[in-house]
A protein has these predicted regions:
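Conserved catalytic-core segment of nucleotide-activated headgroup transferases in glycan assembly
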Residues: 1-57
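Catalytic binding pocket for nucleotide-activated donors in carbohydrate/polymer assembly enzymes
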Residues: 7, 55-61, 88-162
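Active-site donor-binding acidic/aromatic loop of nucleotide-activated sugar
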Residues: 62-69
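Short acidic active-site motifs
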Residues: 70-74, 127
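Structural alpha-helical scaffold elements that stabilize or flank donor/cofactor-binding regions
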Residues: 74-76, 114
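Acidic donor-binding loop of glycosyltransferase active sites
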Residues: 77-84
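C-terminal alpha-helical cap of glycosyltransferases
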Residues: 160-178
Length: 178
């Protein structure tokens, strides 16, 4: 901090924004839990987050579960949608053609711009409830493969996907090494 006097201020502002996001996310989960159409809400903490903290924040809410078991792709695959704010799981959900709901309740300076450009962007609790319930109601009518045959432009600029398995590509690289 001695070399850059603005660095301390930036770190404090980033941390304050993170705490505000957590507070708003908890409010959103509690709001959805009371006003939803009968679905359960799974909160999967980031690997760097303390799961016990989330369990304390969300305890005694019957249809909310804090779970970190297994790989994220299984949870994405078995969900009807993914709600997030600044989470790279939105990228995985988009690639998997799973509906993504990006909840941005206030202007954020330090958030992941790529992840927050994906999915249905909502700013208020009422917008969030309407979008989540709409996705839930129409989930059986939507063929997930029809959510879009191509990825959003923002991801096409960042990802290259083809039909070749990663293991096959590695073998080809190894075979080229003399």
């Amino acid at each position: 901090f001695d070399r850059d006097s603005d660095l301390l201020k930036k770190r404090i502002n980033e941390t304050a924004e993170d705490y505000s996001k957590i507070y708003e996310y908890i409010r959103a989960i509690k709001f959805l839990s009371v006003n939803n159409l009968g679905y359960d809400i799974i909160l999967r903490p980031h690997p760097s987050e303390d799961i016990e903290t989330w369990e304390i924040f969300l305890k005694d809410i019957p249809n909310v579960h804090v779970i970190r078991k297994g790989p994220i792709n299984a949870w994405v695959h078995n969900s009807f949608a993914v709600m997030h704010n600044s989470c790279t799981t939105a990228i995985e959900a988009t690639v998997s053609k799973k509906p993504v709901i990006t909840y941005i309740p206030f202007e954020q300076k330090y958030a992941s711009q790529l992840a927050n450009k994906l999915g249905h962007r909502v700013k208020s609790l009422d917008e969030l409830l309407k979008k989540v319930n709409n996705v839930f109601e129409t989930r059986e009518n939507n063929n997930q493969n029809e959510l879009g045959n191509s990825l959003p432009d923002i991801l096409l600029k960042k990802l290259y996907l083809d039909d070749e398995l990663a293991a096959e590509k590695m073998v080809k690289v190894w075979e080229k090494i003399e």
